[in-house]
Amino acid sequence: MKVIAVTGYKPFELGIFKNDHPGVGCIKKALHRKLTTFVEDGLEWVIISGQLGVELWAAEVVFEIQVEYPDLKLAVFTPFLEQEENWKEDNREYYEFILSQADHVDSITKRKYESPEQFKLKNQFFIEKSDALLAVYDEEKPGSPKYIVETAKKKGEIENYHSYFILFSELQDIIEEEQWNNAE
C-alpha cells in the first residue's frame, strides 16, 4: 500500500468544538498508531480533502510522523475551490496552516461550490487514487463519512481495496489507557 485516503467525522459530529478538546488527542493517538504501522509497511502518501475534524487532525499526525519518516507525504485534494470561505476565522487559519505544510494541494473540480455532486466526485476520486481507506468511523453512528465508506466498500467487493476503521471502542481503550497511565 503506497497511498491511503484518511477521513472521519467532522468535529461537531463528535461534540468537539475546539482543537484542545481531550477527544482530539485520543483520535490523533489512534491515527498515529495506524499510520505509523502503514508507513513501516511502505506507505508513501496520505491524502485528505481538508475537511475540519479527523482529516485535519490526520494532517497534524502526518507532520509528526514526518520527523521520523521524512519520506511520508501529505496531499490535500479539496472537493472544490475555497471550501473554507464560510468558516470561522480561527478554522480558516488552521486550515491554511495545514495547506501551507502539505506536500501537494489541489482542487478536484477546479471550481467553487456548485452542488453536492462535487462531494460525490471527491469520494470517487479518493477511492480511485488510493490503495486503501482509513476512517474514524463507526457504523452505529453513520455521519458524514458514510458515503465515502460505502464507495470504498463497493470497490473492495470487486477489487483488492481495503478499508480500515478506528472505532469508538478503540478510542475508548485509548482514553482508559491514558487514565491508567495518569493514575500511576
UniProtKB/Swiss-Prot annotation:
Superkingdom of the organism of origin: Bacteria
InterPro entries membership: YspA
Organism the protein comes from: Bacillus cereus (strain G9842)
NCBIfam families given in the database record: PRK13660.1
Name assigned to this protein: UPF0398 protein BCG9842_B3730
SUPFAM superfamilies according to UniProt: MCP/YpsA-like
Family: Belongs to the UPF0398 family.
PANTHER family hit by this protein: UPF0398 PROTEIN SPR0331, UPF0398 PROTEIN YPSA
Alphabetical list of HAMAP family matching this protein: UPF0398
